[in-house]
């Protein structure tokens, strides 16, 4: 059965975790690799005495539509090609598949491809999954024709897709959870457990309302560290 974070699940000290002192590889989009994300990864490293290596690339998703030079299967291939073995492989879902309108079934299929690549290339390793984060301001935004018209034409389609498709984000997260349950992968539902909502989102997001700021990463870092420790 899929392992899902429950608050308070990790009551022991970090030193007692079987994941203490391990090597962790992280794959994903900009959530996993922008400068501010170093806050949460440094926290994992501190609490778990872990060495954390980021393979994530901005704009990446599970589907090749997000870019063959960026997508997660390619990140995993590059990681495995280094010959370095990691103890824990974290798949951190972005919102790029959502905004690009990737079919849910395609997201599911490519998550399974990522899992299979890791299981084949590093059979002794653990795989953990972090869901996409909520982006409440964009999820609740209404498409404004006047705002759209005021934009340079080259930006309009992406903007329209972002606003329309982002309302489907909960469906993508539900499918991420379903796949992890099927594959017996521990799943951290950041969408529901991060505590980020439409009221506090301005405190936790940068000006684009899509990427967390330093306060946002400070807000989720302990939830993530406890999840890693417990699984």
What positions do the PLM features span?
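Boundary at the C-terminal end of the N-terminal hydrophobic targeting segment
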Residues: 11-15
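Catalytic His-Asp segment of secreted/periplasmic serine-dependent ester chemistry enzymes
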Residues: 135-231
């Amino acid at each position: 059965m899929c392992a899902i974070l429950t608050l308070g699940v990790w009551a022991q000290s970090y030193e007692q975790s079987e994941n203490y002192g391990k090597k962790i590889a992280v794959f994903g989009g900009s959530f996993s690799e922008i400068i501010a994300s170093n806050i949460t990864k440094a926290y994992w490293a501190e609490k778990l005495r872990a060495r954390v290596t980021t393979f994530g690339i901005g704009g990446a998703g599970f589907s090749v539509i997000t870019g063959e030079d960026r997508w997660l299967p390619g990140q995993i291939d590059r990681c495995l090609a280094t010959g370095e073995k990691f103890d824990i492989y974290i798949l951190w879902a972005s919102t790029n598949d959502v905004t690009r309108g990737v079919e849910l079934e395609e997201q599911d299929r490519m998550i399974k491809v990522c899992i299979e690549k890791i299981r084949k290339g590093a059979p002794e390793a653990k795989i953990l999954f972090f869901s996409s984060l909520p982006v409440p301001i964009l999820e609740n935004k209404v498409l404004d024709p006047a705002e759209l018209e005021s934009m340079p034409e080259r930006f309009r389609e992406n903007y329209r897709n972002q606003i329309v498709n982002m309302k489907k984000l909960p469906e993508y997260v539900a499918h991420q959870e379903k796949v992890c349950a099927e594959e017996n992968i521990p799943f951290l539902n950041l969408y529901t457990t991060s505590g980020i909502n439409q009221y506090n989102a301005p405190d936790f997001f940068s000006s684009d309302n899509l990427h967390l700021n330093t306060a946002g990463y400070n807000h989720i870092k302990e939830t993530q560290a406890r999840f890693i420790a417990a699984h």
